[in-house]
């Protein structure tokens, strides 16, 4: 993923990095305010993430990186 490329939705990103097993699990964590994006609680599962965004869930941090790396 590059700065000018397509973004990824928060719930999809959580599944992609293995933080959750299902979209339903992602939805519940996000709705319950257990997911932070760049240090702020995010309750929109459709929030679009771009390169450099940092997602924190269940004590783990994941940074959106270029070329499909997390």
Kindly label every feature range from the protein language model.
Residues 45-70:
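C-terminal structural segments of small proteins and small subunits
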Residues 8-51:
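A basic, amphipathic helix-loop patch mediating RNA/tRNA/ribosome contacts
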Residues 1-6:
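A detector for short, charged/polar N-terminal pre-domain segments
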């Amino acid at each position: 993923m590059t700065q000018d490329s397509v973004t990824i939705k928060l719930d999809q990103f959580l599944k992609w990095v293995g933080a959750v097993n299902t979209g339903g699990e992602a939805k519940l964590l996000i709705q319950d305010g257990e997911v932070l994006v760049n240090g702020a609680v995010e309750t929109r599962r459709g929030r679009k993430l771009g390169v450099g965004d940092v997602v924190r869930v269940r004590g783990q941090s994941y940074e959106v990186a270029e070329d499909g790396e997390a």
